[in-house]
Amino acid sequence: MQEIITNNIPTFKLQNDVDMVEETQPTTPTTQPTTPTTNTISTTTNTITSTLNTNNISPILEESEEEDSNELIIETDENNTSVSATGTTPTSSSSSSSSSPTNTTTTTTTTTTATTANNDFKNITSNNINKTNSNVNTNSEIKNIDNSIMNSLNRYNNITTASPSNSTMITMKSAISSLDEIVKNTMKAQRESFIANEDKESLPEPQTNSNVNGNEEAKDEKEIHLLAKILLNFSSNGIAVPNLSESSPAVLNTKLKDSSNLVPYGGDLNTSVNGVVGNSSGMVDLSASTGDLLGSLNAANKKKRQRTSPEQLAILEQIFETDKMPSQQIRVRLANQLGMSSRRVQIWFQNKRAKVKRGGPFGKGDDNDDLFAEGEDIIDEDEDEDSSLTIDESGNNNNNSGNNNNNNNNGIMGGHGMLSSSPTNLNTSSDNIVPSISPMLTSININSSSSTPTLQSVNLLNNTNNNNNNNNNNNNNNNNNNNNNNNHTTTTTTTTTTTTTSSSPPLTSFNFQLNQSLNKLTSPPSPPSIVPSPNKKTKQMGGFSLNSTASSLPSFPQIKLNSSSKHIPTDKQNNSDFSNFNNNNNNNNNNNNNNNNNNNINNNGNNNSNNNDSNNNNNKSNFSDYQPLKFHNSIVKN
C-alpha cells in the first residue's frame, strides 16, 4: 500500500490491510498535535478491520464526503485538546500530560480515526492516490509559505514600529531639501558652474509645489542675468563662459561680440561656448565670433608684407641687367635712393638671381613680384643687415693660395688665373664682398647705347701687363711695391679706381665721363682695404705724366670679381678702344730676360728695373681728350 497523507493527522502505512505503523506527523505553527497512545492505535486498527468486513461501506463513505466538505474552526474541548483542520475531518488526541484518558476522549479518537480510515479507503478505491497526495502536498506548502510571509510581515512591522528607521528617512529627505535651499540662497554664482549643475542633478528634488519651483527658477534667471553683466563689465583678462541652462541670457552673446577687451583662453572658451550652444535654443553661435577674434589677434601679430613699387622695380631691374651681384656699397646707396632697407635690396637680388637660374627670362621679371615672391633665398628683414656679410679688410687678397704662378703667359693680372672661365675661381657669393672695389666701377655705364653686357665689377684698362714667372708672389703691403727675387707687380689702372663713396654719383643716371670724375680728384684717398690708415696721403712721384700715382691704386690680384664669369663676353670687338692710347704694352715672352734681380720687359720705352715699378707714357695728354671710357674685360694678347 502507498502512503496516505492528510492535513493535521498522523500518517499511517497499511501492512497487509491489518497492521498500521506511525511514520511522521507534520507540525503547524500554531498547534502541536500529541502522539496517539497505544490504546488509540489498537482501537483504530480494530475499527478499520471491522469496517472492511461489514456491508455498510457506502453510508460511511457518504457521511465522510459530507464531512470533507465542511470547514471546521479551531475549537477547544473540555480537556484543552487542540483540534484544527481545513477541509478535513477534525482530529483530536488526548494530552500527553494526562496519564489515563477518559472514555469520552477514547470515543472521540475512535470516531475520528474511523472517519479518516473511510476517507483513505475512498482514495484508494478511486485510484487517485497520486493526485490526492500531490494536491495535499501543494496545499500544505502553500500554507507554510503563507505562514512564513505573515511571520516576516509581523517581524517587519515590529521592527519598523520599534526602530526609528522611518523617521530617519524622513529626516534625510528634509535635510536634503534644506541643503538644496541653502545652495539656492547662498551659492548663486557657483550654481552656474558644472559642479553646481552636477550636484543639482545628483540630489533628489524636494517635493514642493510647481508654483514655488517656477518662482525660484525665475529668480535664478534674473540673478544669472545680473551676474553675466557684472562679469562682462569687469573682466579684463577674459571670461570663462559658464555652462548655462536652456534659458541662458541673450545679453551675454551681444556683449561677447562687441567687447574688445576680452582675451579668450583658446580651446577652453571654444569648448564651453560650443557646449552652451548645443544646449540652448535661443542662443547665437559664439564660435564664429571667437574665431574672428582669434584671427584678428593673429593678424595683428603678423608683420605687414612690404611690396616694392613699380618705380623701385624698374630701377632694380635696370641695375640687375648691368650687375647681377652688386656689392654692399651699391646696395646701401640703392636702399637710400629707393627708400628701402639694404636687406630688402639684397633679398630682391637673391630672389631675382634664383628666378633667372630656374629658367626665367634674362633681365625680365613680373612687376608684381614682391620681396618675398621667391622661396629659395628669402631671409627675414628683422635680422641684422650686416650679420651675413663678411668683409675682408686685411689688405691681402690672394686667390689660389695667394700665389699666381704663371709660366710664359700673357694677359691681365699675369695670366688667366683670375679670369678663368671656371666659376669656381670667382667670388659668386654676395655675402663675401671686398670693399676695395670702387662702387663707381660696378655702377658706371658710360655708353648707354651699348647693348652688350660688359664687365661691370672691374674696370681694367690694360696699359701694362703682369709678367710673373714661376716664383712670382704678388704682395701689396702699405702701398709699397717690393720686387724681390723676380717679384714684379704692375699696378696701373684708370684713376676711376680711386674714386670712393666720397663723391658717389646719383643712381638716376649711370652715364659719366672720365673728366667729370677727375675734376673732383685732388689727392685721391686709398681704398679702405688697401691702406690701414685712410688719412695717409700718397706721394707724387716725378717724371710721370699721370695725375694719380700708381702706388695709390690696388693691385690686380687684390680685386675680386663680383659678377659671374658666364656673363663675361668673349668678343674682341672692343679691342679697338685701346687705339686711343699711344703706348701699348706688348709682352713678348721670348724677350723677357729673367735674371736674379732684373726684369726686362719690352714695353715700347717702358723700363721696369729691380726696385722701380713705373709705367712711362711717352705722350702727355689730358684725360678730357679721351673718349668716354667703356668697361672691358677682354684680354689683350699678342
Swiss-Prot record:
Keyword list, A-Z: Developmental protein, DNA-binding, Homeobox, Nucleus, Transcription, Transcription regulation
Record feature DNA-binding region, as residue ranges: 301-360
Role, per record: Putative transcription factor.
One of the GO biological process terms: cell differentiation
Entry GO MF terms: DNA-binding transcription factor activity, RNA polymerase II-specific; RNA polymerase II cis-regulatory region sequence-specific DNA binding
Lineage: Eukaryota, Amoebozoa, Evosea, Eumycetozoa, Dictyostelia
Cellular component aspect of the GO annotation: nucleus
The species this protein was found in: Dictyostelium discoideum (Social amoeba)
SMART domains in UniProt: HOX (SM00389)
PANTHER family: HEMATOPOIETICALLY-EXPRESSED HOMEOBOX PROTEIN HHEX, HOMEOBOX PROTEIN HHEX
Keyword Hydrolase: no
Record InterPro entries: HD, Homeobox_CS, Homeobox_DNA-bind_prot, Homeodomain-like_sf
Region (Disordered): 23-55, 76-139, 195-219, 381-431, 448-638
Composition-biased stretches (Low complexity): 24-55, 80-139, 388-411, 419-430, 462-501, 575-625
Protein name in UniProt: Homeobox protein 10
Keyword Iron-sulfur among record annotations: no
Cell compartments where the protein resides: Nucleus
Pfam families for the chain: Homeodomain
Polar residues bias (residue ranges): 205-214, 502-522, 545-573
